[in-house]
């Protein structure tokens, strides 16, 4: 089909008008405008299907971010200590007794947990409830060691509980009643229990049977592989239907999938985001770290965002493993304008 020059000019006019709207009225008003416009097109029968896929970008842009409430550099140093202690805990247990244990789960989620511990989780009599991803337990123990609530002897006896001075492999309130609050292994138990915990608390609160702190939250930390378990997403529609605004899922998409290979070749973040969004959840993507901010600010053509949205998980794993030169060629090299950003 021949290119329609007039249609192309009209399209550019529409895009220019949208950019004007964004510049002078802001993101929120522009989102509302776009939503109503798309709904109008849909009502006219001009859109066959609406995608629920979110862009492979951070949901909160740089100019919308709040100032970080802590000292990032000090917190980063503490994270390094915790990661190291978690690593050594597992390695020592394997060196002599071949007991197993998980290293990469906590290593990839350390920032998520530390931001939570330092700035979100609240203690006290009516504290927040946290369902920790089971395989991340070495990191939680390592943090407690820095705080002084777990001894070196405890860490040395990871997965060695017979003498009474060890640490359970995973969150286990029966074996460690003064430490763990909820069991989250086998995989899939944590997500569905968190949903029903939030549900019963909301039920009791609305009937005056439970006095809660304002904004008391139930946090559920899990991995992308765990979301394959039928229990993990089996009740997510209930959470939306019952308006459980006291529930937060944090899904660490580290692409490891300990219990099996990936089942497709796209982006698991995009897939899960679409599923939760379609079920009625508010979905927030946190994908790109602050070191990408300068590059994204220079991306006036949108080429870098195009590359991000046209790269699949398997490629991202390659980029992480094969270094800068490979990434420059095969990631930024997908678009000439993106490549110019790193020349």
Where are these regions (language model features)?
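Conserved alpha/beta enzyme-core scaffolds, especially Rossmann-like or related mixed alpha/beta domains
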Residues: 98, 103-106, 212, 221, ...
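Short acidic/glycine-rich loops and adjacent helix/strand connectors
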Residues: 15, 146, 270-274
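Long, compositionally biased, glycine/small-hydrophobic-enriched stretches that function as flexible linkers
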Residues: 33, 39-42, 48-53, 188-190, ...
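Cofactor-binding active-site loop characterized by glycine-rich and histidine/acidic residues
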Residues: 64-82, 86-96, 102-242
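Short internal beta-strands
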Residues: 130-133, 246-254
């Amino acid at each position: 089909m021949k290119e329609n020059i007039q249609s192309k000019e009209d399209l550019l006019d529409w895009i220019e008008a949208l950019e004007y709207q964004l510049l002078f009225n802001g993101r929120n008003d522009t989102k509302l405008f776009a939503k109503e416009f798309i709904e109008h097109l849909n009502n006219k029968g001009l859109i066959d299907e609406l995608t629920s896929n979110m862009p492979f970008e951070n949901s909160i842009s740089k100019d919308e971010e709040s100032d970080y409430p802590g000292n990032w550099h000090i917190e980063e140093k503490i994270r390094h200590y915790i990661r190291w202690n978690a690593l050594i805990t597992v390695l020592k247990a394997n060196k002599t007794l071949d007991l197993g244990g998980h290293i990469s789960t906590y290593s990839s989620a350390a920032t998520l947990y530390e931001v939570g511990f330092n700035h979100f989780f609240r203690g006290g009599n009516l504290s927040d409830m946290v369902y920790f991803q089971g395989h991340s337990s070495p990191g939680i123990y390592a943090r407690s060691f820095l705080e002084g609530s777990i001894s070196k002897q405890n860490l040395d006896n990871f997965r060695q509980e017979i003498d009474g001075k060890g640490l359970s492999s995973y969150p286990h309130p029966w074996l460690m009643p003064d430490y763990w609050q909820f069991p989250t292994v086998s995989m899939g138990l944590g997500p569905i229990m968190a949903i029903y915990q939030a549900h019963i608390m909301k039920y009791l609160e609305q009937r005056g049977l439970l006095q809660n702190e304002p904004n008391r939250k139930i946090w559920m930390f899990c991995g992308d592989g765990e979301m394959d378990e039928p229990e993990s997403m089996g009740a997510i529609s209930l959470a939306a239907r019952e308006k459980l605004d006291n529930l937060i899922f944090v899904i660490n998409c580290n692409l490891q999938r300990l219990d099996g290979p990936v089942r497709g070749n796209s982006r698991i973040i995009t897939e899960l985001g679409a599923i939760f969004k379609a079920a009625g959840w508010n979905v927030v993507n946190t994908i790109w770290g602050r070191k990408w901010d300068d590059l994204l600010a220079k991306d006036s053509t949108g080429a870098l965002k195009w590359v991000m949205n046209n790269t699949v998980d398997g490629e991202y794993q390659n980029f992480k493993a094969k270094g800068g030169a490979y990434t420059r060629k095969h990631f930024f090299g997908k678009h000439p304008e993106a490549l110019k950003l790193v020349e």
